[in-house]
């Protein structure tokens, strides 16, 4: 592999060194990479369960969550595909909210999801803001309309919906009351509400919600026929999300790990139990926020915590193994030049996220 990468003109170091946000030079990071490669071959649910019990005991003794390196290790100790042996898998929806800047890689995002999701995909639901004339997507560049049209025409099961249609009247009224029209502060809470609203409205047993800046790199089974699902453990830790989840739903957190993983399966019956009155329940969840613009609301965190607390037998914990990359331009250029798949360019990871706000290229940030 090293010789092949060199022949292709690519770095022979770990992908974290040349696509990641931080240099891969420390001994601890190098050890984690060795562990990562070994654990992917084991896919052991037993090892994952033992490590979670040890982590819970450690946090109970300490009285708080552990540090980032310990959380990363715990996530890596989980199986990457704990439901791999399952057969007769139920079909699910794939839901991808996006904006114009995401069109550059949206086709690749869909390709990677279809390649690596083992469950059949019944529908691909693309969700984007509508323009002020209510005539189509809110795009600035004329060529963006053709790019989207080509994506939609390439697959028969794609459905295009607009934010306003997904959110519904109760949420739209609350947005108008709080922010008026065009307030950028509405962006964060709108994202949370769109994903949960889409999951609520799904006719499938579950929806895989996928951020439009995230590529899936590893085959995974998301849901089995008895309703048991993959729930990945993240490296991040968001205290505000957890405090609000405890406040609104009364859900404590024994396993002090995050579920903010940039993509997550949401089962329809679980989301409907969380928000039994649909849009009105979502508004109540928002109104219980202690932050003026809802920055303590976390869609992935609240669903994961609720599921783990109320339906523990329906949870199969898995490894996140995500690479956070500020180098979308470099990645796309390398892929174009070599013809390699994303999995080959970024081996050893389950997904990679190119968050626009972190990109080193201003054009990729949407500036």
Predicted regions and their residues:
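Short aromatic/hydrophobic "clamp" motif used to bind/position activated sugar donors
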Residues: 207
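Membrane-proximal basic amphipathic "stem/tether" segments
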Residues: 2-90, 352-355, 360-367
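Active-site-proximal specificity loops/subdomain of glycosyltransferases
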Residues: 144-197
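Short, acidic, metal-binding catalytic loop of nucleotide-sugar glycosyltransferases
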Residues: 112-121
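Catalytic core and acceptor-binding pocket of nucleotide-sugar-dependent glycosyltransferases
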Residues: 257-340
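Conserved donor-nucleotide/metal-binding helix-loop-beta segment in metal-dependent transferases, i.e.
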Residues: 217-246
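Short beta-strand/loop segment that forms part of the nucleotide-sugar
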Residues: 121-131, 161-164
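A conserved hydrophobic helix/loop-capping motif in glycosyltransferases and polysaccharide synthases
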Residues: 93-101
């Amino acid at each position: 592999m090293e010789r092949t990468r060199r022949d292709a003109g690519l770095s022979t170091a770990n992908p974290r060194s040349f696509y990641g946000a931080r240099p891969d030079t420390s001994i601890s990071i190098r050890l984690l990479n060795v562990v990562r490669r070994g654990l992917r071959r084991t896919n052991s649910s037993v090892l994952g369960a033992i490590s979670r019990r040890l982590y819970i005991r450690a946090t109970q003794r300490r009285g708080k969550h552990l540090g980032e390196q310990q959380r990363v290790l715990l996530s890596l100790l989980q199986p990457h595909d704990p439901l791999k042996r399952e057969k007769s898998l139920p079909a699910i929806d794939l839901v991808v909210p996006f904006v114009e800047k995401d069109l550059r890689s949206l086709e690749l995002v869909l390709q990677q999801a279809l390649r690596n999701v083992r469950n059949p995909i019944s529908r691909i639901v693309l969700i984007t803001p509508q323009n002020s004339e209510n005539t189509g997507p809110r795009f600035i560049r004329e060529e963006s309309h053709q790019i989207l049209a080509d994506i939609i025409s390439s697959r028969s099961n794609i459905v295009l919906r607009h934010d306003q249609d997904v959110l519904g009247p109760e949420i739209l009224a609350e947005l108008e009351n709080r922010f008026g029209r065009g307030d950028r502060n509405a962006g964060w809470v709108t994202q949370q509400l769109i994903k949960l609203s889409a999951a609520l409205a799904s006719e499938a047993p579950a929806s895989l919600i996928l951020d439009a800046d995230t590529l899936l790199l590893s085959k995974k089974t998301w849901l089995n026929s008895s309703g048991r699902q993959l729930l990945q453990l993240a490296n991040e830790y968001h205290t505000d999300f957890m405090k609000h989840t405890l406040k609104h739903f009364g859900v404590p957190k024994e396993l002090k790990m995050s579920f903010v993983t940039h993509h997550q399966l949401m089962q329809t019956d679980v989301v409907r139990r969380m928000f039994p009155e649909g849009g009105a329940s979502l508004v109540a969840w928002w109104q219980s926020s202690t932050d003026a613009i809802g920055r303590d609301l976390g869609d992935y965190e609240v669903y994961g915590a609720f599921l783990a607390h109320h339906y523990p037998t329906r949870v199969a914990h898995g490894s996140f193994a995500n690479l956070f990359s500020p180098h979308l331009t470099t990645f796309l250029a390398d892929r174009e030049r070599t013809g390699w798949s994303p999995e080959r360019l970024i081996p050893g990871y389950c997904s990679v996220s190119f968050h626009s706000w972190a990109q080193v290229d201003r054009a990729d940030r949407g500036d």
